[in-house]
């Protein structure tokens, strides 16, 4: 089956949704060779993936993940990664802020692959447990309002593609579909995308898969986050409609900042800067970029009617130390201690 589908791709043809499902299922069930996986990923990268293909791939990935029953009122803040900007873990900081405001967050993430610091790396440095069972994850969500879903634990079938992905080295379709396969089956998300040219395709894919409100964001300085230093391109899926717009820091009540203020070299620096944001001892740009991204998430969650209102609410949570108190709660509940 996979040989036939590879031949079809080699002829420049695209796969149907069902063919894409079968191709990804073959990969994730361990029935494809490393050469076949590398060939598929390479051809898709050169040609570009269609919405049918993305939908089939995500369906196959979701069908093989270990899911948790988190209810309908859960949001995720996750990115494709690979933006090369070496920023601290902004989406992780935003997740802590919005969870301090009563919005449940199922943060889906991994260790660093191409970045300086993955969300798992920085949470460990902060003393927050990342490797929990589905039952423990659900309990953390109910008691703390935030749980971290460590991708390798919930997507064990991904191990079959790990070798080829590492060997070829470039971004693949897995960077795009990973954020679309949250084990909590979130219908509301903010997804950072390393290139805005993928955003409409991803939005249409999520529409087909039943998402309610998702914003795909790309800073014009290359961030897979909303940028504090320049404009951010946004593609929004809301109630079945898709629209594109641009947001600037100024229009949501924030001054423009410096990208250098949010860049780090390693997980230790990232954790230190995240904590400094929570204690309001970080550079203003760092505090504001977290407020901006948290504000977008509050809007996606339906907590506010506008992004600007969300930013105001998020910044108040930081300045009032509500976000820092939430960080301390997460440490108290899930701190990792050596035996």
Swiss-Prot record:
Pathway entry: Amino-acid biosynthesis; L-tryptophan biosynthesis; L-tryptophan from chorismate: step 2/5
EC annotation from Swiss-Prot or TrEMBL: 2.4.2.18
Family matches, as SUPFAM superfamilies: Nucleoside phosphorylase/phosphoribosyltransferase catalytic domain, Nucleoside phosphorylase/phosphoribosyltransferase N-terminal domain
Residues reported in the UniProt entry to bind anthranilate 2: 165
Family: Belongs to the anthranilate phosphoribosyltransferase family.
Subunit structure: Homodimer.
Protein's name according to its UniProt entry: Anthranilate phosphoribosyltransferase
Origin organism lineage: Bacteria, Bacillati, Bacillota, Bacilli, Bacillales
């Amino acid at each position: 089956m996979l040989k036939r589908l590879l031949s079809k791709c080699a002829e420049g043809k695209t796969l149907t949704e069902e063919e894409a499902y079968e191709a990804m299922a073959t990969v994730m069930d361990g029935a494809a060779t490393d050469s076949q996986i590398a060939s598929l990923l390479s051809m898709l990268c050169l040609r570009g993936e269609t919405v049918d293909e993305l939908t089939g791939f995500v369906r196959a990935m979701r069908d093989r993940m270990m899911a948790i029953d988190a209810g309908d009122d859960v949001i995720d803040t996750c990115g494709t990664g690979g933006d090369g900007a070496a920023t601290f873990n902004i989406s992780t900081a935003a997740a802590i802020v919005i969870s301090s405001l009563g919005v449940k967050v199922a943060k889906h993430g991994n260790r660093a692959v191409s970045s300086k610091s993955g969300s798992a790396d920085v949470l460990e440095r902060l003393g927050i447990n990342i490797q929990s069972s589905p039952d423990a994850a659900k309990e953390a969500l109910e008691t703390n309002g935030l749980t971290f879903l460590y991708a390798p634990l919930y997507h064990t079938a991904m191990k079959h593609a790990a070798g080829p992905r590492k060997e070829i080295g470039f971004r693949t379709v897995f960077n795009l579909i990973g954020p679309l396969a949250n084990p909590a089956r979130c219908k509301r998300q903010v997804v950072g995308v390393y290139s805005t040219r993928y955003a409409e395709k991803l939005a249409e894919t999520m529409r087909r898969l039943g998402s309610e409100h998702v914003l795909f964001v790309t800073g014009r300085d290359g961030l897979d986050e909303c940028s504090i230093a320049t404009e951010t391109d946004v593609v929004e899926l809301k109630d079945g409609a898709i629209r594109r717009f641009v947001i600037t820091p100024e229009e949501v009540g924030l001054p423009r900042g410096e990208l250098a203020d949010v860049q780090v070299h390693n997980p230790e620096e990232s954790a230190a800067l995240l904590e400094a944001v929570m204690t309001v001892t970080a550079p203003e740009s760092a505090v504001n970029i977290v407020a901006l991204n948290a504000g977008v998430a509050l809007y996606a969650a339906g907590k506010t009617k506008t992004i600007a209102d969300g930013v105001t609410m998020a910044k108040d949570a930081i300045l009032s130390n509500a976000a820092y108190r939430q960080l301390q709660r997460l440490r108290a509940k899930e701190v990792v201690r050596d035996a």
